[in-house]
């Protein structure tokens, strides 16, 4: 946020203000010009006003005074000419004929960076101490006095918002002004005494041999105006805001001039500020204008005409403003207003109000000038509405709520990563990965295609700070070459918390698998299977839904743990699933299932199976053989140990049988259960225990 200092007496030179300094400060604040401070200096009051970036017109005394005129319903003296005590005005000599001192030449090599440049040659100047009133005025706004010539340029800067610069003309080689790009290796000592090495591309003001100023930022010491100066070249120009901003950042110098150029100066103000400064120098410093040069003239943008309906504005603001009052407010702010029909105007914004583009902007102008504090308080009308939620958003919400309910903690990581993080995670960087053109750091220059590297980094951070037990997840976007999808990544490690009649125990892969199955069941996803890849890779299982791969689940390898600096011996279980893939098959409709009116009966099955037989195949066969009677199926235990041959697993599966129409007898259940056992032995070659 930038601040603009202006004195109460300076405002009164433009506007006949009747309010006290304190009350005027309150009115300015209520009109959007927040007064940060008000202090009395040498018998005058000085306001320090916050200036928003889209209001460069407030960076001038005239701009502030114009606002004061609007909010106090007072005339703005735009054509005011300062009378300088004890100084007899001299007529400006506009001679342009060939004379010995008429040797100024101006050329612009980069017209895009400098679309308009004025140079006035003023001779016979006597640079001396400024009069007391000028020194006092500059001091009140935080500027120190240098000499009368420089002080006049600073005064016009603060009054018009147009930066000016005075060169000692006799120190310009060949009497030339050339606006060009710097050449690599050129150097310039600035007015602050600091030497800068100029990089190629920096916009400079140069004479025939060397740079004499950095355009729009600061002049050079070699051509500054001193007490020995007799002839000056007065500069007023318009520079491209982006060029000035880049230049100021490159050399590390920000000045009052560069700040205004960065926010774009008013084109008509370029000449207005120049003429005012020229007249004052001729009046106060004994100078004579002998030649005025101009290079370029930017095309004026087409003035945008805005149709403004006062009735609509009044309805929005809930205030009573007459057509005459509204037009007067806009006119005092510099707008051109034409009547079209009753309470409808055609409004044209002035050149210094580039922020006004639509009717709502004009409504704001009227509200500010009317006074925000005068707008009555009203109770807003509350209308019932329903917010549409997409299926992807609903699945994301359900997944997040379920994982939190199961004890997982959500983490949020950066969406940017690096090749190093992929390598540490043993993940190959996919071809076509999106990379930033101008990254702030090489550690964060790739758009992630997986959540796992960031989760691994999070695990490393926590484990190495004595937090070995964690259950974390992240739901976030990942980025393919041409599309953006949503994934959920989960990490699980350490000991499972103690439960009723159960002690702590280490987490297993099946805890994570169970969490995923709970998620799939909550989303009513059908047709999912966990398949062990052949040959076995880093992932223990790949997750397929209707034949399409949707994710993976596995154990972090020791090599990956070492690369991430993870020193715990316990396994870290990892999973990543595409929620976008789940969204294509999920069913979020809630279906009411009535409470069974008949009792159910549970039976357990214990079998020996090889590692190559997936549980999904066993489950599918049981559901097929017990169709119509099976109410629930759950894997109660998976055991590998002394009593189980190597390469095999002992599974205990709990089955719940029941009927919606009658109570099943033992004979009926035994028949169905025997059919299931027969299928497990004959079709899957399992061994019953």
Model-derived segments and their meaning:
Residues 2-372, 376-392, 397:
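RNA/tRNA-interacting regions in translation and RNA-turnover enzymes
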Residues 5-8, 22-26, 331-335, 355, ...:
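A carboxyl-terminal module marker
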Residues 260-276, 489, 495-498, 502-523:
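A conserved active-site cap/scaffold subdomain adjacent to cofactor or substrate pockets
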Residues 46, 437, 468-503, 545, ...:
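Polyanion/phosphate-binding surface patch
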Residues 11, 277, 313, 490, ...:
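Residue-level signal for inorganic ion chemistry
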Residues 74, 80-81, 100, 208-245, ...:
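Conserved alpha/beta core surface patches that mediate binding of polyanionic ligands
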């Amino acid at each position: 946020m930038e601040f603009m200092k202006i004195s109460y007496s300076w405002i009164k030179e433009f506007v006949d203000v009747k309010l006290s300094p304190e009350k005027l400060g309150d009115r300015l604040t209520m009109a959007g010009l927040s007064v940060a401070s008000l202090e009395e200096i040498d018998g005058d009051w000085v306001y320090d006003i916050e200036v928003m970036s889209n209001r460069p017109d407030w960076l001038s005394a005239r701009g502030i005074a114009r606002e004061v005129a609007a909010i106090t319903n007072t005339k703005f003296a735009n054509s005011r000419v300062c009378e300088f005590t004890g100084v007899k005005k001299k007529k400006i000599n506009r001679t342009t004929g060939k004379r010995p001192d008429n040797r100024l030449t101006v050329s612009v090599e980069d017209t895009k960076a400098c679309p308009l440049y004025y140079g006035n040659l003023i001779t016979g100047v006597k640079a001396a101490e400024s009069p007391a009133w000028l020194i006092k005025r500059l001091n009140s706004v935080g500027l120190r006095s240098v000499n009368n010539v420089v002080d006049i340029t600073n005064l016009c800067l603060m009054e018009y918002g147009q930066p000016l610069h005075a060169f000692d003309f006799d120190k310009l080689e060949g009497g030339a002004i050339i606006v060009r790009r710097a050449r690599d290796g050129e150097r310039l000592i600035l007015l602050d005494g600091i030497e800068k090495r100029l990089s190629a591309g920096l916009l400079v003001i140069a004479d025939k041999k060397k740079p004499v100023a950095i355009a729009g930022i600061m002049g050079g010491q070699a051509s500054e105006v001193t007490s020995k100066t007799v002839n000056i070249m007065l500069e007023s120009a318009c520079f491209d805001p982006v060029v000035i901003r880049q230049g100021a950042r490159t050399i590390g110098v920000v000045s009052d001039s560069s700040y205004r150029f960065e926010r774009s100066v008013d084109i008509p103000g370029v000449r207005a500020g120049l003429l005012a400064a020229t007249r004052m120098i001729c009046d106060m410093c004994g100078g004579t204008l002998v030649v005025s040069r101009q290079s370029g003239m930017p095309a004026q943008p087409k003035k945008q005409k805005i149709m403004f309906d006062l009735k609509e504005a009044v309805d929005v603001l809930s205030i009573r403003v007459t057509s005459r009052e509204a037009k007067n407010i806009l006119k005092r702010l510099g707008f051109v207003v034409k009547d079209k029909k009753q309470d409808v105007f055609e409004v044209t914004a002035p050149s210094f109000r580039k922020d006004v583009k639509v009717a709502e902007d004009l409504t704001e102008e009227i509200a500010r000038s009317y006074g925000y504090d005068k707008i009555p308080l009203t109770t807003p009308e509350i209308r019932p509405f329903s917010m549409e939620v997409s299926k992807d958003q609903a699945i994301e919400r359900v997944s997040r709520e379920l994982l939190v309910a199961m004890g997982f903690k959500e983490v949020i990581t950066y969406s940017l990563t690096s090749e190093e993080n992929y390598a540490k995670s043993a993940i190959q960087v996919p071809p076509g990965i999106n990379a930033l053109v101008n990254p702030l750091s090489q550690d964060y220059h790739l758009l992630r295609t997986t959540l796992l590297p960031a989760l691994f980094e999070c695990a490393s951070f926590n484990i190495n700070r004595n937090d070995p037990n964690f259950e974390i997840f992240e739901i976030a976007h990942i980025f393919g070459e041409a599309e953006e999808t949503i994934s959920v990544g989960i990490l699980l490690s350490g000991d499972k918390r103690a439960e009723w009649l159960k002690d702590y125990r280490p987490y297993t892969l099946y805890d994570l698998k169970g969490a995923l199955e709970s998620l799939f069941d909550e989303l009513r996803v059908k047709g999912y299977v966990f398949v062990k890849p052949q040959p076995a890779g880093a992932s223990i299982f790949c997750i397929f839904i209707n034949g399409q791969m949707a994710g993976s689940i596995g154990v972090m390898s020791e090599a990956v743990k070492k690369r991430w600096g993870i020193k715990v011996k316990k396994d870290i279980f990892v999973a990543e699933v595409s929620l976008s893939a789940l969204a294509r098959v999920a069913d979020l409709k809630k279906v009411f299932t009535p409470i069974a009116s008949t009792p159910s009966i549970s039976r357990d099955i214990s079998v020996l199976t090889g590692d190559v037989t997936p549980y999904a195949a066993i489950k599918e066969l049981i559901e097929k053989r017990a169709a119509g009677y099976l109410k629930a199926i759950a894997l109660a235990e998976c055991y590998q140990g002394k009593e189980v041959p190597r390469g095999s697993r002992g599974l205990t599966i709990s089955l719940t049988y029941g009927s919606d129409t009658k109570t099943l007898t033992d004979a009926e259940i035994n028949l169905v259960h025997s059919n299931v056992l027969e299928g497990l032995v004959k079709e899957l070659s399992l061994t019953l225990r």
